[in-house]
A protein has these predicted regions:
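C-terminal functional extensions of proteins
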Residues: 196-239
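Solvent-exposed alpha-helices and their adjacent loops that cap or buttress functional pockets
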Residues: 51-54, 83, 108, 125-129, ...
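Glycine/threonine-rich flexible loop motifs
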Residues: 70-73, 165-169
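Short, solvent-exposed amphipathic alpha-helical segments in soluble enzyme
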Residues: 77-78, 108, 171-175, 202-205
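Short, acidic/small-residue loops that bind anionic groups at enzyme active sites
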Residues: 113-121, 158, 165, 172-200, ...
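Acidic/glycine-enriched connector segments
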Residues: 75, 98-159, 163-164
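Glycine-rich beta-alpha loop segments
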Residues: 20, 24-117
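Arg/Lys-rich, intrinsically disordered low-complexity tails that mediate electrostatic binding
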Residues: 1-20
């Protein structure tokens, strides 16, 4: 009997498909598999739904954890949060020290609800400043998602470092890409003769826009303010 010749194409049909096994980067997921990490993220979102489900949207304040009372950034933040609280909006903040604590104090002084969205870090778990509710997160992403969701009236950025910059740029990009509702993104300059954010705006205008990677009309919702009165005016104009 003649053996039937099988073409390479035909023989490929009879081969068992091999499933590739992908190893998750356990180091980046704290030793968890991809499925375990996904479930952990989902649990944090469910916790937010249970804890803050009936809490109205408000104004999110962000800034450095490294400032202390007596620092003009800290002191002006208290005044700003108080003024915003008097408008009747809940204040959402990170629950940590520094600018986050100042936001909580201002919220309490203005009689508004203070909601702490805390991140578990190596240091002792502690909520800084007065607060009515607190939610603890194990990961950055669900915390940022919650700030984005509940800070839908406006988001105020006081001076901060890499974390604050990440939150600010992430929010701006989400709004630009229509992944989040438009709201004012406000950068607050607490000290008139020592600008903190102006350099960022100069870079966007004189470098990024000049080479065509951004247009002014892409970010009409981004503001820079230099006083509490200006901050209140921007928020009132949008609501």
């Amino acid at each position: 009997n003649k053996k039937k010749k099988v073409s390479k194409m035909d023989s490929g049909k009879h081969k068992r498909s091999r499933k590739r096994k992908f190893k998750s980067n356990s180091a980046s997921n704290n030793g968890l598999s991809s499925n375990q990490f996904g479930r952990r993220i989902a649990r944090q979102h469910k916790l937010v739904a249970r804890t803050l489900g009936r809490t109205p949207p408000g104004i999110a304040f962000m800034g450095s954890a490294r400032t202390r009372p007596g620092n003009p950034y800290y002191d002006v933040n208290i005044e700003a949060a108080k003024a915003v609280a008097l408008l009747g909006f809940p204040i959402y903040h990170g629950g940590g020290p520094g600018q986050m604590e100042a936001s909580a104090i201002g919220a309490a002084q203005g009689g508004a609800k203070s909601v702490a969205l805390c991140l578990r870090l190596a240091r002792k778990e502690e909520v800084f400043g007065p607060h009515d509710q607190a939610v603890w997160f194990d990961d950055f992403s669900p915390r940022v998602d919650t700030l984005r969701r509940f800070g839908s009236i406006a988001m105020v950025f006081f001076p901060g470092g890499i974390g604050t910059m990440h939150e600010a740029m992430s929010m701006i990009d989400n709004i630009m890409q229509k992944k989040a509702p438009v709201r004012p993104i406000i950068f607050f300059e607490p000290v008139a003769d020592k600008p903190y954010w102006q350099g960022l705006f100069d870079w966007l205008k004189n470098v990024v826009m000049v080479v065509g990677l951004l247009k002014a009309e892409d970010i009409p919702f981004v503001h820079i303010v230099r006083s509490v009165d200006e901050l209140v005016a921007v928020i009132k104009a949008q609501n």
